[in-house]
């Protein structure tokens, strides 16, 4: 029996977006969903109890960072990631591939894996499909990701073709090295950049390997949003209807809605907590930078339409004061609000799918948020 099972519930008649549920060894979560990112086994400044209060059913942790600190063997000795961080709901771990390609100044890609330098101290390291599986098996996440090559945008067709072929070979090695398929589901990652032919080849290779789920990788790496949407339009239909589909590294409100419309079930991004640390908040009226001087005497909530802990209890003026004084509590309040905003947005997306009106919801939300305006400020 597979560790991960996707239950299809319904399709939106207006857009084709799908409502579903993913069942894991640590509970089920409704889709489409957003996964808060807990890189180092913590969602920055948030407690597990606060994440549960927001109704987060799954979070993401990072294989590369946990391998370096504290080390996957320590996490294994603690009883796995769930016990180590006191989180009894689902966890997804990425493979470390993206970090190897984005954080390391020096790297050498060979067929056996990638040689690179530790971004913390410069030590030489080596990560392979087998090592990525060993680390993730020790971490004990519910969903683990295959080790893939993450080419930058833009890349030539020739380079991307070689990269896709290598990613497929690595995916097969990941399947062979995976030691715990009965309680950890391994997802394959479709690559291919903006090239339809290569996406088609990558999807065909991976679907033939019968992974329990599939991710679309290599997007949200600097390409314009219209390219991302176009790639999703020709990639998502290549993936099995009875498996979850995950768009990696995407977390802006407009992209979550547009991704759901194109058949995506799962999203993750550091965006909500990263921008929160600079005082940037997502609200139903659009982007709000609470550090701005105009909020010094504004005693209203960050978002009058939000019922989160932050908005029910604290004013813009108070949060601005905390942020200007570099008080950690200010970052906690903005982080809580942004995470709640995205998780609540996904609940609204699911409700719109239930009611067959996601296209209308998108139009209303984009208008209210200001995404339709020329020169609209995005994240």
Swiss-Prot record:
Catalytic-site annotation from UniProt: 94, 268
GO biological process, one term: tRNA-guanine transglycosylation
Record text on cofactor binding: Binds 1 zinc ion per subunit.
Gene3D superfamilies: Queuine tRNA-ribosyltransferase-like (3.20.20.105)
Keyword Metal-binding: yes
Top EC class, one word: transferase
SUPFAM superfamilies membership: tRNA-guanine transglycosylase
GO cellular component: cytosol
Binding site for substrate: 94-98, 148, 191, 218
RNA binding: region residues: 249-255, 273-277
Co-factor requirement: Zn(2+)
Top-rank taxon: Bacteria
Reactions performed catalytically: 7-aminomethyl-7-carbaguanine + guanosine(34) in tRNA = 7-aminomethyl-7-carbaguanosine(34) in tRNA + guanine
Coiled coil spans: none
Enzyme Commission code(s) on record: 2.4.2.29
Keywords for the protein's UniProt record, in alphabetical order: Glycosyltransferase, Metal-binding, Queuosine biosynthesis, Transferase, tRNA processing, Zinc
One Pfam short name: TGT
Pathway connected to this protein: tRNA modification; tRNA-queuosine biosynthesis
Subunit and interaction comment: Homodimer. Within each dimer, one monomer is responsible for RNA recognition and catalysis, while the other monomer binds to the replacement base PreQ1.
Family: Belongs to the queuine tRNA-ribosyltransferase family.
NCBIfam families xref list: Q_tRNA_tgt, tgt_general
Biological role stated in the UniProt entry: Catalyzes the base-exchange of a guanine (G) residue with the queuine precursor 7-aminomethyl-7-deazaguanine (PreQ1) at position 34 (anticodon wobble position) in tRNAs with GU(N) anticodons (tRNA-Asp, -Asn, -His and -Tyr). Catalysis occurs through a double-displacement mechanism. The nucleophile active site attacks the C1' of nucleotide 34 to detach the guanine base from the RNA, forming a covalent enzyme-RNA intermediate. The proton acceptor active site deprotonates the incoming PreQ1, allowing a nucleophilic attack on the C1' of the ribose to form the product.
Full protein name: Queuine tRNA-ribosyltransferase
Organism per entry: Bacillus cytotoxicus (strain DSM 22905 / CIP 110041 / 391-98 / NVH 391-98)
């Amino acid at each position: 029996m597979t560790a991960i099972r996707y239950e299809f519930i319904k399709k939106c008649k207006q857009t084709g977006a799908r409502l579903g549920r993913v069942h894991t060894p640590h509970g089920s979560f409704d889709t489409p969903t957003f996964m808060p990112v807990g890189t180092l086994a913590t969602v920055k400044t948030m407690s597990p109890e606060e994440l549960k209060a927001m109704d987060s059913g799954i979070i993401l942790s990072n294989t590369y960072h946990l391998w370096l600190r504290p080390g996957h063997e320590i996490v294994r000795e603690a009883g796995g990631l769930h016990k180590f961080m006191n989180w009894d709901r689902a966890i997804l771990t990425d493979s470390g591939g993206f970090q190897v390609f984005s954080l390391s100044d020096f790297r050498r890609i060979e067929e056996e894996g990638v040689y690179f330098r530790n971004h913390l101290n410069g030590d030489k390291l080596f990560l392979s499909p087998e090592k990525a599986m060993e680390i993730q098996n020790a971490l004990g996440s519910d969903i683990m990701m295959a080790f893939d090559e993450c080419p930058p945008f833009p890349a030539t067709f020739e380079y991307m073709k070689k990269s896709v072929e290598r990613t497929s070979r690595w995916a097969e090695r990941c399947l062979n090295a995976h030691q715990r398929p009965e309680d950890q589901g391994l997802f394959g990652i479709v690559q291919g950049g903006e090239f339809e032919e290569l996406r088609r080849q990558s999807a065909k290779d991976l679907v033939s390997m019968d992974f329990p789920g599939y991710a679309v990788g290599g997007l949200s790496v600097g390409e314009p949003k219209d390219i991302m949407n176009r790639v999703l339009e020709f990639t998502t239909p290549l993936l099995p209807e009875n498996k979850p589909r995950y768009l990696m590294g995407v977390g802006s409100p407009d992209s979550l809605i547009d991704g759901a419309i194109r058949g995506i079930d799962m999203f993750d991004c550091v965006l909500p907590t990263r921008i929160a640390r600079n005082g940037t908040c997502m609200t139903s009226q659009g982007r709000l930078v609470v550090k701005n001087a105009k909020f010094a005497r504004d005693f209203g909530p960050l978002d009058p339409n939000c019922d989160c802990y932050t908005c029910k209890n604290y004013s813009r003026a108070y949060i601005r004061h905390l942020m200007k004084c570099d008080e950690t509590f200010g970052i906690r309040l903005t982080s809580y609000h942004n995470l709640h905003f995205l998780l609540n947005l996904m609940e609204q997306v699911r409700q719109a799918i239930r009611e067959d009106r996601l296209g209308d919801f998108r139009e209303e939300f984009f208008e209210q948020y200001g995404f339709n305006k020329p020169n609209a400020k995005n994240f």
